[in-house]
Protein backbone atom coordinates (compact mmCIF):
# COMPACT_ATOMS: atom_id res chain seq x y z
CA UNK A 1 0.00 0.00 0.00
CA UNK A 2 1.29 3.44 -0.79
CA UNK A 3 1.99 5.99 1.90
CA UNK A 4 0.42 9.40 1.29
CA UNK A 5 3.21 11.41 2.92
CA UNK A 6 4.42 14.49 1.09
CA UNK A 7 7.57 14.46 -0.99
CA UNK A 8 9.85 17.42 -0.29
CA UNK A 9 11.44 17.45 -3.73
CA UNK A 10 9.27 18.40 -6.68
CA UNK A 11 9.64 16.04 -9.63
CA UNK A 12 8.38 16.58 -13.14
CA UNK A 13 8.71 13.66 -15.53
CA UNK A 14 9.45 14.62 -19.11
CA UNK A 15 10.30 12.58 -22.17
CA UNK A 16 13.98 11.63 -22.10
CA UNK A 17 14.85 13.19 -18.76
CA UNK A 18 13.63 13.81 -15.24
CA UNK A 19 13.51 17.41 -14.04
CA UNK A 20 14.03 17.91 -10.31
CA UNK A 21 14.43 20.93 -8.09
CA UNK A 22 18.19 20.25 -8.20
CA UNK A 23 18.53 19.96 -11.99
CA UNK A 24 18.20 17.27 -14.65
CA UNK A 25 18.76 13.58 -14.01
CA UNK A 26 19.54 11.59 -17.12
CA UNK A 27 17.68 8.29 -17.60
CA UNK A 28 21.09 6.66 -18.15
CA UNK A 29 21.52 6.63 -14.35
CA UNK A 30 18.41 4.50 -13.99
CA UNK A 31 19.48 2.26 -16.86
CA UNK A 32 22.89 1.74 -15.25
CA UNK A 33 21.30 0.87 -11.90
CA UNK A 34 19.01 -1.69 -13.54
CA UNK A 35 21.94 -3.15 -15.47
CA UNK A 36 23.94 -3.57 -12.25
CA UNK A 37 20.98 -5.19 -10.50
CA UNK A 38 20.35 -7.67 -13.33
CA UNK A 39 24.07 -8.45 -13.56
CA UNK A 40 24.15 -9.12 -9.80
CA UNK A 41 21.04 -11.29 -10.09
CA UNK A 42 22.71 -13.51 -12.69
CA UNK A 43 25.93 -13.64 -10.68
CA UNK A 44 23.93 -14.97 -7.72
CA UNK A 45 22.26 -17.59 -9.93
CA UNK A 46 25.64 -19.38 -10.01
CA UNK A 47 25.08 -20.90 -13.45
CA UNK A 48 21.48 -21.97 -12.84
CA UNK A 49 18.96 -21.24 -15.58
CA UNK A 50 16.52 -18.42 -14.86
CA UNK A 51 13.00 -18.36 -16.25
CA UNK A 52 10.59 -15.52 -16.91
CA UNK A 53 13.30 -12.94 -16.22
CA UNK A 54 11.57 -10.28 -18.31
CA UNK A 55 8.35 -10.42 -16.28
CA UNK A 56 10.29 -10.61 -13.01
CA UNK A 57 12.37 -7.52 -13.82
CA UNK A 58 9.32 -5.55 -14.97
CA UNK A 59 7.37 -6.37 -11.81
CA UNK A 60 10.33 -5.62 -9.54
CA UNK A 61 10.74 -2.19 -11.17
CA UNK A 62 7.06 -1.42 -11.72
CA UNK A 63 5.82 -2.03 -8.16
CA UNK A 64 8.18 0.43 -6.43
CA UNK A 65 7.72 2.92 -9.27
CA UNK A 66 3.96 2.89 -8.77
CA UNK A 67 4.36 3.15 -5.00
CA UNK A 68 6.66 6.17 -5.27
CA UNK A 69 4.49 7.91 -7.87
CA UNK A 70 1.39 7.36 -5.73
CA UNK A 71 3.21 8.82 -2.71
CA UNK A 72 4.34 11.80 -4.77
CA UNK A 73 0.80 12.50 -6.01
CA UNK A 74 -0.68 11.85 -2.55
CA UNK A 75 -2.87 9.10 -4.01
CA UNK A 76 -4.22 11.17 -6.91
CA UNK A 77 -4.60 8.56 -9.65
CA UNK A 78 -5.23 11.09 -12.41
CA UNK A 79 -1.98 12.93 -11.67
CA UNK A 80 -0.11 9.64 -11.26
CA UNK A 81 -1.37 8.34 -14.61
CA UNK A 82 -0.36 11.59 -16.29
CA UNK A 83 3.12 11.43 -14.77
CA UNK A 84 3.51 7.83 -15.94
CA UNK A 85 2.12 8.54 -19.41
CA UNK A 86 -0.62 5.91 -19.10
CA UNK A 87 -4.39 6.18 -18.79
CA UNK A 88 -6.08 6.02 -15.41
CA UNK A 89 -7.73 2.66 -16.14
CA UNK A 90 -4.34 1.10 -16.84
CA UNK A 91 -2.96 2.60 -13.64
CA UNK A 92 -5.86 1.14 -11.65
CA UNK A 93 -5.20 -2.33 -13.09
CA UNK A 94 -1.52 -2.07 -12.21
CA UNK A 95 -2.27 -0.86 -8.68
CA UNK A 96 -4.66 -3.78 -8.21
CA UNK A 97 -2.07 -6.23 -9.58
CA UNK A 98 0.37 -5.18 -6.84
CA UNK A 99 -2.24 -4.85 -4.09
CA UNK A 100 -1.98 -1.06 -3.96
CA UNK A 101 -5.64 -0.23 -4.63
UniProtKB/Swiss-Prot annotation:
PANTHER family reported in the protein's UniProt record: DNA-BINDING PROTEIN FIS
Residue ranges for the DNA-binding region feature of this UniProt entry: 77-96
Family: Belongs to the transcriptional regulatory Fis family.
Function: Activates ribosomal RNA transcription. Plays a direct role in upstream activation of rRNA promoters.
Self-association state and partner proteins as the record states: Homodimer.
InterPro entries (alphabetical): Fis_DNA-bd, Homeodomain-like_sf, HTH_Fis, Trans_regulatory_Fis
MF terms (GO), sorted A to Z: DNA-binding transcription factor activity; sequence-specific DNA binding
Domain of life the protein comes from: Bacteria
Protein keywords: Activator, DNA-binding, Transcription, Transcription regulation
HAMAP family recorded: DNA_binding_Fis
Organism name: Shewanella sediminis (strain HAW-EB3)
Listed SUPFAM superfamilies: Homeodomain-like
Protein name per Swiss-Prot or TrEMBL: DNA-binding protein Fis
Name of the gene: fis
Keyword match Transcription: yes
Amino acid sequence: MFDQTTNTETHQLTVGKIETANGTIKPQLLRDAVKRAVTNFFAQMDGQEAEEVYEMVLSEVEAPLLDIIMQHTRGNQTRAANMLGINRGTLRKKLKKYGMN
